[in-house]
Curated annotation (Swiss-Prot):
Taxonomic lineage: Bacteria, Bacillati, Actinomycetota, Actinomycetes, Mycobacteriales
Domain of life: Bacteria
Native organism: Corynebacterium glutamicum (strain ATCC 13032 / DSM 20300 / JCM 1318 / BCRC 11384 / CCUG 27702 / LMG 3730 / NBRC 12168 / NCIMB 10025 / NRRL B-2784 / 534)
Name of protein: Uncharacterized protein Cgl0967/cg1104
Pfam family, one: Esterase
Entries under Gene3D superfamilies matching the protein: alpha/beta hydrolase
Amino acid sequence: MNEWRTVSLVDSTALTVIISVAVFTSAVALLGVVKKRSRWRVLGALISSAVLTSGAWVVIEKLWKPFPDPNPWTIYLSAGLAVFPLLSILFRTGRTRILMATLTVIALVNTAAVINVIYQPYPTLGSFNPVPTAVSMSYADFESQTTAPTMDDREVGALVQVPLAGTTDDSTSGFDARDAYAYIPPAYWDNPSLQLPVLVLMPGNPGQPDQWFSSGNADQTADNFQATHDGISPIVISVDGTGSFSGNPACVDSDAQSVMTYLSHDVPMLIKQKFRVNQDQRTWTIGGLSYGGTCALQIMTNHPEAYGSFLDFSGQEEPTLGTRQQTVDQLFGGDEDAFKAVNPEDLLNQAISSGAHTYSGISGRFIAGSNDKSAVSALSHLDNLSNQAGMSTTFDTVAGGHSFQVWRVALANTFDWVAKRGGLQV
């Protein structure tokens, strides 16, 4: 009955369907070439779509650079194949325009499917409507909750949407963060004397805090753990590290935003205010994917007192707005030394050369997709530096690229370690 839920949207069959749809829509849109009276209209639409797509690539990848990682060329190709029938509407008349409009809708859906194959937020049809493993609630509802939530005759955790902006009177950063999402295990109610450790997670860029639960399966991972540990699990809180879906503040304190102060000072303070947690932040872990992974290492190297451990999944070698020079110019007023003063690689090298014990007691896990060559290179290098600087870290790869295929597995593989670092029995 539920076989449809397991239908893959990212396997070879799905890829074959995507390619077939792309060929079909393009071929139909090109049919007008064989007719002399419409040939130039079709060619005009084709050339215009190529120019617009190329222009979009230049703006996004070379000029604007809103994302720290380049987008795969296949995204631009699939988008261009959608723009072609869209522009054809302007060059056609009558019923042909209706056909082109239909092809445009199909091609746009196909482009979304291409993006999904690359980043895999929705690996199956069922992932669009996942089976809940925790009871979703507002923070107000959470405050009035006196017993562990139940589902299907068993105790489960709560998935709480919680305001966590750094704009309160006792906050320091002034960072207007989006709402965080927190998984609270059943033991929070069943055993109030427990001092549960915290795992703070950050999404990538583009991204939003709830992605760690909607696509990263963080609630499923935590539920699997608590189900075999008497309802006990680390509290998992996914927080905002960018300020907007496509924002890229590079996880630093700048004239525009104080993101590093928010994550190192305000987030722990606000979590302690809103939840009953282990007060010793050395039992806490901060982590993230892509931009979030880069940010986690930035926090640990700049503020080693804020957390005891970190997870860097598919992070970059350094915080970036595209190039080193662009980053220095836009965020540090052109001051290279100011950039180096907060850059993890430089801070680790300083600790190595000075022999300082700044990072003693800190542990971390670097994980990259085996096909994500830039992340493999960056994280293996940073792992080596981290160990030389006095941390205890490891580097590993899992099958996949720069996608949720990797990040779901990475979190599941490290969750026991996070719990153990937090003082829980594993």
